[in-house]
Amino acid sequence: MNIRPLHDRVVIKRMEEERTSPGGIVIPDSAAEKPIKGEVVAVGNGKLLDNGETRPLDLKVGDKVLFGKFAGTEVKVDGEELLVMREDDVMAIVE
């Protein structure tokens, strides 16, 4: 199944963080925080403005991004956990 976000929404796949502390302790899944970094896998066609025009999104597929830990809505597509959020919820592009 394909997922295509509407308007100013983007679909993001979380990027797994390191599961070992600087001291070498392995952090179990139950104690680890969800990553706030991810990769854009799909983008909508743009933000609908008040005047009826559509502004293209700044994000593109493949961008590595940072977002808030409570941003977006989690969805499962073909067994893969993804986040759907508005472009405004993305804080930065990691270059």
UniProtKB/Swiss-Prot annotation:
Listed under GO biological process in this entry are: chaperone cofactor-dependent protein refolding
Q: Name one GO cellular component term.
A: cytoplasm
Gene Ontology molecular functions: ATP binding; metal ion binding; protein folding chaperone; protein-folding chaperone binding; unfolded protein binding
Checking InterPro entries in the record gives: Chaperonin_GroES (IPR020818), Chaperonin_GroES_sf (IPR037124), Chaprnonin_Cpn10_CS (IPR018369), GroES-like_sf (IPR011032)
- Annotated localization: Cytoplasm
UniProt keyword list: Chaperone, Cytoplasm
Question: Where is the major localization of this protein?
Answer: cytoplasm
Q: Name one Pfam family in it.
A: Cpn10
Write out the function statement from the record. Together with the chaperonin GroEL, plays an essential role in assisting protein folding. The GroEL-GroES system forms a nano-cage that allows encapsulation of the non-native substrate proteins and provides a physical environment optimized to promote and accelerate protein folding. GroES binds to the apical surface of the GroEL ring, thereby capping the opening of the GroEL channel.
Q: How does it assemble?
A: Heptamer of 7 subunits arranged in a ring. Interacts with the chaperonin GroEL.
Q: Which family does it belong to?
A: Belongs to the GroES chaperonin family.
Report the protein name in the record. Co-chaperonin GroES
From which organism does this entry originate? Alkalilimnicola ehrlichii (strain ATCC BAA-1101 / DSM 17681 / MLHE-1)
